[in-house]
Amino acid sequence: MKQAIGFIDSGVGGLTVVREVLKQLPHEQVYYLGDTARCPYGPRDKEEVAQFTWEMTNFLVDRGIKMLVIACNTATAAALYDIREKLDIPVIGVIQPGSRAALKATRNNKIGVLGTLGTVESMAYPTALKGLNRRVEVDSLACPKFVSVVESGEYKSAIAKKVVAESLLPLKSTKIDTVILGCTHYPLLKPIIENFMGDGVAVINSGEETASEVSALLDYHNLLDATDDEIEHRFFTTGSTQIFKDIAKDWLNMPDMTVEHIKLGK
């Protein structure tokens, strides 16, 4: 019987990481929990985000996952090190992989970071980037409207184009040549963001680099699954199963997926 990789996020954003993992590791089984009812996490204080992150973690650990991916930048910034220290399974977040990918891409060491208010205020990306390259200059920009655009399924709409243009205008006058999508919801807006920023700016989806790290860590711990046993992905949400399913089946190309509704907290 397969053991699943667990993924947690404040909503549907972490599906962008799941997609990259399943591209690289098609034999793996996924358990995903999106806390859509309490999304967004960005405006919440760190202690509350950490509490919510632990609630999601415990839910999936109780279901026997072999590894945990905190597929949410705000949750990674608030709780990664505490969870990693206390669990006896491998745990990774999305900030370090995204930082490494950006440093590979930049030519002038000027990097922009788009994130939620919580991620930007945590200084997690500048800390990670400067820890890897002291010469790098970082411009961080909170884009609080992006998550609601994605969660409402409007990420391909004219509304999305307007919100992106208004939000990213401050970055146009900078000399950045690389932008990190510092929230796992944002890759669903990547085509619009790339179009607005122009050809000279590389837009980094940390999901790809995170997937590579998942693969390496599973291999290191001898947890990779290469068997042809039946795969039973499970998707859980605290919010609307229909809205979650509409976005997830499109993004993951899983038309027959089932989404289960759960409750967390009090």
Swiss-Prot record:
- Cell membrane among keywords: no
Q: In which pathway does it act?
A: Cell wall biogenesis; peptidoglycan biosynthesis
Reaction(s) the record says it catalyses:
L-glutamate = D-glutamate
Keyword line: Cell shape, Cell wall biogenesis/degradation, Isomerase, Peptidoglycan synthesis
Instruction: Note the InterPro entries from the entry.
Output: Asp/Glu/hydantoin_racemase, Asp/Glu_race, Asp/Glu_racemase_AS_1, Asp/Glu_racemase_AS_2, Glu_race
Q: Where is the active site?
A: C72 (proton donor/acceptor), C183 (proton donor/acceptor)
Annotated residues that bind substrate are located at: D9, S10, Y41, G42, N73, T74, T184, H185
HAMAP family the UniProt entry points to: Glu_racemase
Give GO terms: molecular function aspect only. Answer: glutamate racemase activity
Q: Tell me which positions the record assigns to the signal sequence.
A: none
Q: What is its EC number?
A: 5.1.1.3
> What is the name of this protein?
Glutamate racemase
Q: Which family is it part of?
A: Belongs to the aspartate/glutamate racemases family.
- Keyword Cell wall biogenesis/degradation assigned to the entry: answer is yes
